[in-house]
Amino acid sequence: MMRSTALEDEIESLLKANAILTVGSNEAAVAINGIAGRMNLRARVHIKIDTGMGRYGFEPGEFEKISAIFTYMPNIEVCGMYTHLNAAFGNKKKTLGQIAAFHAVVAKTREQGFEPGMVHFANSSALFKLRGVELDDGVRIGSAFTGRLAFACKDSGLRKVGYLESRICEIRWLTRGATVGYGGAYRARNAIKIAVIPLGYSHGFATEKIRDSYRFRDGVRFVLQDIKRTLTHERLWVEIGDKRVPVLGHVGMLHTVVDITNLDCALGDAVRFDISPLYVSAAVLRKYI
């Protein structure tokens, strides 16, 4: 379980499932120890150290709380210790500082005569970005399992996993001047042949994380990204057969319109959408090959 919890019902369910829990606070440790004792078992846990994410975990200076788990909580078996890196995709100096702070806690744990178990800090970005850095006992791969990383890495050897697939449900010609999508965002300069595909943002296409950071430098970065997309005419596309075709106008909730003027295709032809599986709606049928 990769998050800490002090909620009794969650802890009971996890223990019944024989799961390994995360302990990231004194409250969680006390709750887990008590419930495990009541259930007449020992809970296996990994202790989370917060070196910068600010979510779950003991801060490096809270070692008394960490040592209390080993000393005063007999129903807890510590089998691991970890931290999570918040900028491994770009800020190497900051990342190495986080790793050093984490390793200091691990070293102090051992100096006090306690065994931290499996030690791990590396996420997908750290695995591919921190070449030459000792990665301890294990790595926690997330986005790399989908063949995607948070930074450009030409030699990762990864292949994208997962795509959305639908079929062409409508083919028609639009006259010059006709518009496509909400707001009429696309206007045809000439007569064009279009295909309508019954798949849109409600299924996970053309969705992205909200820009939720309010630092000035992030705002500048977002503006520059938008300018680049505008100047380079970067567009969304889908794949029909072995050809990429551009999306026209705004993607709708349930539909996407594409330009097939120069493509030989027919109703019912398969259409592939390149998309991260992380954004695909739970309502979409999944097939594993």
Segments and roles (model prediction):
Residues 99-289:
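Active-site anion/phosphate-binding pocket segments in diverse small-molecule metabolic enzymes
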